[in-house]
Amino acid sequence: MANTRPENPSLGLVIPCYNEEAALPHLLVSLEAVQKKANIPIRVLLVDDGSQDRTYEIIAAAIHPGSNLACIRFSRNFGHQIAVFAGLHHVVGDVIGVIDADLQDPPEVLLKMVNKWREGFDVVYGVRRNRKENLLLRSGYSLFYRMLQGIANIEIPLDSGDFCVMDRRVVELIKQMPEHTPLIRGLRSWVGFRQTGLEYERAARVDGESKYSLPRLVNLAVQGLVSFSALPLRLAAWLGFFTSIVGFALMIWAIVSAVGFGKTPPGWASLAVIVLFFSGVQLIVLGIIGEYLGRVFEEVKNRPHFIVESSLGWVAPADQSRS
């Protein structure tokens, strides 16, 4: 392969955590079991995304001199995708894995992904065969992935989240992306290189509650739409064109009715319907444009992506923010 793999690679893991005090003890046990099975060194970076429970205290108690664990703690909650993005900026290793703390994605699958990476793939992402969430969330996720794949200007694999391993050069390229609202799975696809999927059974949460509610999923979907497609803007233009044709047709109908047949078009009721229809179309178009303008506004402010309040373990205390 063009990209030569090191003989003794190291694996770095990025694990975003937000109010995961219930799941963390199980996660730490699973990570220890994976470390015993692995024939490569593993370093784990836990990113505390401004948790309000005992997440940070549990992590701090698990870190000791010589530990392969480290942690960075945000000054507030910046969001799951930003937590992964920050982890990519601080993690070390020849190959980098991303996994959530809830153990829905089995850590032992990471070792199979690393084997695929050894074969020459630069990105190995997990493909979920099934999900154990409730019907509403399963339907929402399914719709999100299919809609994103259908309108994005790049190929984003179906049913693949952030669970993956990436070659170091892929991570370095993602770190250069300036987006303040990054969608990691989208950026991972955008960089290209050799990518492949690995199917696995997605489990139920080991403990605690899911942090991705339906409103958060909708926000993630909007983020994906405006980040990787201009189709909504094109649809708005076509909608405007269609409504203009409808308006022109109504005008012709009114003229023909009055001049040719001596019939006066219906009064205030039809006028109210027409006004409401066109007003609704205008508001929809303004909303779409506003969503894109809002993203541009966030980018031009150029605020830091995140702020690190403190760090523990092997992670360097430098680079406390990313602008």
Model-identified regions with their sequence ranges:
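A ubiquitous structural signal for well-ordered alpha-helices
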Residues: 27-30, 34, 58, 113, ...
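A generic fold-level signal
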Residues: 6-8, 39, 91, 158, ...
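Hydrophobic helical membrane-anchoring modules
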Residues: 2-10, 183-323
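Acceptor/aglycone-binding surface of glycosyltransferases and processive sugar-polymer synthases
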Residues: 70-76, 80-90, 104-187, 203-222
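Short conserved micro-motifs on helix faces and helix-strand junctions that flank
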Residues: 16, 74-76, 164, 237, ...
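Structured catalytic core of nucleotide-sugar glycosyltransferases
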Residues: 1-133
